[in-house]
Amino acid sequence: MNYSTENVSSAALRKRKTLKKSINFSIMIIGESGSGRSTLINTLCGGNSIVPTSSTATQDPFTKKLTLRHENVELEDNEGHKISLNIIDTPNFANSINCDDDFKIIVDFIRHQFDEVLLEESRVKRNPRFKDGRIHVLIYMINPTGHGLSDIDVKFLQHVNNLVNIIPIISKADSLTPKELKLNKELILEDLNNYGINFYKFNEYDYEQDYIDEEIIEYNKYLNSLIPFAIIGANEYRSNPNGSEDEDDILKLRILNKDFKPIDIDNAEINDFTILKNVLLVTHLNEFKDITHDSIYENYRTEALSGKQFQYVNKDSAKQEISESDYLMKEEQIKLEEERLRKFEERVHQDLINKRKELLERENELKEIEKRLLAEGLKFDENGDVVKVHEEESSENEVKVI
């Protein structure tokens, strides 16, 4: 194979190198049992990688505790860009009478990911294999009750408010009539605004940029009009009868069995799933990541380094207090250490000068004493005692001293 510059340009090499790197993207999906979380995950990933918890339940669901289930799926778009999609599922969410423990587990997990990044940033020598586990999007599934948010919905969303990009969706939207769905969306939006819940609003982040694309603005206005997204998941996949392996054809054949009648869930007229998937994995993926790092994490980091006591969450969700000094920037610590060492060296150097000066003064004093003793016919013996000397010895010593 010829690898000359005529066949392989530097731009092509850079593109190949870029395509080899996967984009790390993390989504947490929250919903009560039976809300269709597993179905949504399987539809999002294009396969049955998740077994619904309801199908494996053998005990009273109210005795089960919340667990965080992690799934990783490698996806690739038409241009060859790879996405390492990390999905955190939440089986048994809100199964207990008191849901505070469930809220705490999820909030602790989200905060822990921030703490891990904060600790990594504070290290002088960073880990090149460090994996960023921050949650970029939290999809909250709302049951299709025909009403607004439930008390559990409100309390949980208030717990995670300002900690993550929240996207509310109505699950199993096909159980509502178009009129009921429209009313349900209006009531949910009203509750979100009344309770001060900051759900994700499309394009607010982009408006801060110098360049504004009118087409993008219109598209984002359209997306905002769909919130909360109405989703219908798929529990069965059928191959294309024409034998085509084209992904677009396969997508159109995803169906949901409802009263034994198949529903094409990729039809945007009755289902927002295709739009939601495109938002998550194509059009707004980088925006979710940027907001998570530049806005949400920076606010958390500022609070953590502001001098206030806060809670560091370890992997076991046990908490321990950490003060500001534990998060001092390493550069500041190094400067303080260098200053301390410099002062210590100066003190040692000055002590040596003083000792040398004292020794010289003592030596001169001894010489003067010795001269006076010799003049009087005396001297120091080996024990340091003063004794008389013979006259000739005294003369010789006087000559030596002179």
Swiss-Prot record:
In this chain, GTP is annotated as bound at 31-38, 172-180, 233
Coiled-coil region(s): 318-376
Q: Where does the record place the modification N-acetylmethionine? A: 1
- The listed location of motif Basic motif is 14-21
Q: Which GO terms describe its molecular function?
A: GTP binding; GTPase activity; identical protein binding; molecular adaptor activity; phosphatidylinositol-4-phosphate binding; phosphatidylinositol-5-phosphate binding; structural constituent of cytoskeleton
Q: Which residues form the Septin-type G domain?
A: 21-307
The record's region (G1 motif) falls at: 31-38
Q: Where, subcellularly, is it found?
A: Bud neck
Q: Is Nucleotide-binding given among the entry's keywords? A: yes
The record lists the effect of residue 394 to A as: Blocks phosphorylation of Ser-394 and impairs hyphal morphogenesis
| Region annotation (G3 motif) ranges | 89-92
- Tell me which positions the record assigns to the signal sequence: none
Region annotation (G4 motif) ranges: 171-174
Q: Does the keyword Transferase apply?
A: no
PTM: Hyphal induction causes immediate phosphorylation at Ser-395 by GIN4 and at Ser-394 by CDC28-CCN1. GIN4 phosphorylation at Ser-395 primes CDC11 for further phosphorylation by CDC28-CCN1. CDC28-HGC1 then maintains CDC11 phosphorylation throughout hyphal growth. Ser-4 is also phosphorylated in yeast cells but not hyphal cells. Met-1 is acetylated.
Its family remark reads: Belongs to the TRAFAC class TrmE-Era-EngA-EngB-Septin-like GTPase superfamily. Septin GTPase family.
For this entry, the protein name equals Septin CDC11
State the species of origin: Candida albicans (strain SC5314 / ATCC MYA-2876) (Yeast)
